[in-house]
């Protein structure tokens, strides 16, 4: 949506479409669909191709978290006419999987322009959410998976029951079960950025919100679990053939030992450690520890902020649109560092 909004500001001829499963409910003619589409998920692409569309597609990643094995696992990533990496670590993942892929460019994450430019009224937000502004504010924003396991996602909120000033924001996939808990379901237009600005400490497992918090140099706590949804060695729930060989996938699964390296990244020999880490039951005491040593992991935060989000400067959408325009004009991906 941020990229679409910025394109409208630039007076581009663009449309934002929801591609429905039933072609009867799609309020457009496939013949009138653009020769170029921008996607952040593969399902809309599959649907328009099934309807007969045969143009070029541009893929924009929808988060900053590099822990999931999904990213670059499937064929549609490797057939993209233009693919944007949110940051250098994503580029390294692709190079490890497919060193011959030539259509990728560093782009950043358009949603982060809002995080960069945002200002908040802390007093008003604290009053609205019944928080004490004189005490540390804790944001708990886990990844999805709560509906699959009591050990995943928003279910770990129970370990914060006795902690003051906690805001819990579930992943959209867990909204249904989160409604039974003391969690906030943001409006679609609201998002999580204002809560990242508001919080003094951000707690998650493997969510993109950890990297987003590091962009603002906010201390984070990563929850250590024996498995994470969508991460090795857990089996893939998607019924889709992988572009990566089964031998390579089996090798990655066997190499991943969460008890020894909880935050080992897939396909590359790196550990995504941005701050303090702990088991869920140790969250209360770790929060106190973080408050006493906020600067301990400042170098980790800076490093992973830069690795996960390229050029966090408030101009990500503008820069990405310049590269899209250049691609349409020249028919080849061209890396641009500055905006026109």
Give a label for each model feature.
Residues 174-192:
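Nucleotide-activated donor-binding/catalytic signature segment of Leloir-type glycosyltransferases, i.e.
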Residues 37, 53-59, 187-240:
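A donor-sugar binding/catalytic signature common to diverse glycosyltransferases
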Residues 43-44, 89-90, 174, 208-209, ...:
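Alpha-helix capping/helix-boundary segments
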Residues 15-22, 184-189, 272-286:
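Short acidic-hydrophobic, aromatic-tinged amphipathic segments that line or gate anion-handling sites
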Residues 1-119, 146:
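Active-site and donor-binding regions of nucleotide-sugar-utilizing enzymes
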Residues 235, 244-340:
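C-terminal amphipathic helix plus adjacent low-complexity
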Residues 34-36, 78-83, 165-166, 198-202, ...:
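Short active-site oxyanion
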Residues 1, 107-180, 279, 310-316:
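Conserved catalytic-core segment of nucleotide-activated headgroup transferases in glycan assembly
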């Amino acid at each position: 949506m941020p990229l679409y909004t910025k394109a409208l500001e630039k007076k581009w001829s663009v449309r934002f479409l929801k591609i429905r499963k039933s072609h009867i409910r799609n309020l457009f003619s496939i013949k009138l669909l653009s020769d170029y589409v921008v996607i952040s998920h593969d399902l809309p692409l599959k649907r328009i191709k099934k309807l007969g569309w045969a143009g070029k597609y541009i893929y924009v990643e929808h988060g900053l978290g590099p822990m999931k094995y999904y990213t670059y696992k499937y064929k549609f990533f490797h057939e993209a006419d233009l693919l944007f990496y949110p940051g250098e670590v994503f580029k390294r993942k692709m190079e490890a999987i497919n060193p011959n892929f030539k259509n990728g460019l560093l782009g950043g994450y358009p949603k982060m322009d809002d995080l960069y430019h945002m200002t908040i009224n802390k007093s008003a937000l604290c009053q609205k959410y019944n928080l004490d502004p004189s005490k540390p504010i804790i944001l708990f924003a886990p990844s999805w998976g709560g509906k699959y396991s009591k050990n995943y996602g928003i279910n770990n909120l129970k370990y914060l029951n006795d902690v003051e000033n906690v805001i819990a924001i579930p992943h959209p996939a867990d909204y249904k079960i989160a409604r039974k808990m003391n969690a906030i379901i943001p409006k679609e237009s609201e998002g999580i950025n204002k809560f990242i600005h508001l919080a003094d400490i951000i707690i998650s497992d493997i969510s993109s919100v950890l990297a987003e918090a590091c962009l603002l140099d906010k201390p984070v706590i990563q929850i250590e679990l024996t498995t994470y949804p969508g991460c090795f060695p857990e089996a893939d729930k998607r019924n889709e053939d992988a572009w990566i060989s089964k031998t390579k996938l089996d090798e990655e699964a066997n190499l991943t030992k969460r008890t020894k390296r909880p935050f080992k990244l897939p396909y590359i020999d790196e550990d995504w450690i941005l701050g303090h880490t702990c088991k869920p039951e140790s969250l209360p005491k770790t929060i106190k520890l973080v408050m006493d040593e906020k600067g301990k992991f400042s170098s980790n935060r800076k490093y992973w902020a830069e690795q996960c989000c390229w050029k966090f400067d408030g101009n990500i959408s503008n820069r990405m649109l310049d590269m899209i325009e250049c691609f349409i004009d020249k028919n080849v991906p061209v890396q641009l560092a500055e905006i026109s």
